[in-house]
Amino acid sequence: MLFRSLLDAKEYGVGKPVEFRWNQLLSFDACVQCGKCEAACPAFAAGQPLNPKKLIQDLVTGMVGGSDAAYAGSPTPGLPVGHHAGEPNRPIVSSLIEADTLWSCTTCRACVQECPMLIEHVDAIVDMRRNQTLVHGTVPGKGPEVLANLRETGTAGGYDKAARYDWAVDLNAPVAQPGKPVDVLLVAGEGAFDMRYQRTLRALVTVLNKAGVDYAVLGGDETDTGDVARRLGDEATFQQLARQLAGTLANLTFKRIVTADPHVMHSLRNEYRSLGTRYDVLHHTSFIADLVASGKLSPKAADALRDKRVTYHDPCYLGRYNGETDAPRKLLKSIGIQIVEMERNGKRGRCCGGGGGAPLTDIPGKQRIPDIRIADARAIGADVVAVGCPNCTAMLEGVVGPRPEVLDVAELVAAALE
């Protein structure tokens, strides 16, 4: 396995319009200002200072030179039109685009999903974040603390990594060992340190035990995948963490990785490939659905859910990023749940607000993104919101006031096996 030890010049991000790749600049110029990205953006809906349409138009303005005074669309929330200008070789932040605009993005890719011109808004935002982080060192909120924790401890919270699997001590979950092959390697992710999400992981292990799966947990050697570091623009820390975790995995023998965290799945399945690795990585809902389909699990309808209206919230990094929207629904159907869909679902599901490091940068708006998503669930009379991501669990459960119960799909399946 070969990793590059130094960042390329382009990996330090984009600080001026001229530093974007030519094909990015061409795509920005293709914008027809239809506003579909604006209508889909969760940050814009929450009143945070991000309008993806305005951002793209600002980048076009910056490349040709001039001000944003002629922009006729909806303004960026809280930022009046006519106060920003740019030039091809002039710094983007904050003459053309405010730093808070970049840090408001949850990287959910709803804008990209809707764009008829296939513009990659999120990639452009992360490019500009890299310049802010690696060149200027201006990550807001708790971002600097978390990045330091990741570099020093391999965990976002600065925890002792040996405690990552404390939740499994009474479950007889085997720990992966060099020289002991297993079919499935369970990678828990950062959610393992959260007491609420530990219930999800315990439910998942219970399901694996019930099905007789040959598995092992990664154990105390597990370190962060680097997802948050990359979203916050710290490419150097991402590559450091990727080398560390990939080195750990290289010492083990397994057929596939299963994880309950779509961010972990996306990093290992897709982003580590550029670093020279290839893993077969499954989300836990896909893996459990396969167990049910093969007859290794025979769940029954849970009595406690018989009269409940259940909806499913699609995690952005599972649905939009990796195209998996059917397996969780098939799995819920197999335990007798008839899903009541929210208006925005599947690949067009609304973001919970938990991705892209957004809870760390914490840019204020008029309301919270998870409040909007819970309002979607309330609108259809949902009693339970089924989820498949630790970030979604934390964000939706953090909504204040009466709300539907939030349960991971693994918890619902485990209840159906009792």
Identify the role of each PLM range.
Residues S5-A45:
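Acidic, Ser/Thr-rich low-complexity segments on the non-lumenal side of membrane proteins
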Residues A30-C31, K296-A302, V340-C351:
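A glycine-rich, aromatic-flanked flexible loop/lid motif
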Residues C31-C37, C41, L55, C105-C111, ...:
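Short cysteine clusters
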Residues G191-H283, Y317-E418:
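Cofactor-cradling patches in redox/metallo enzymes
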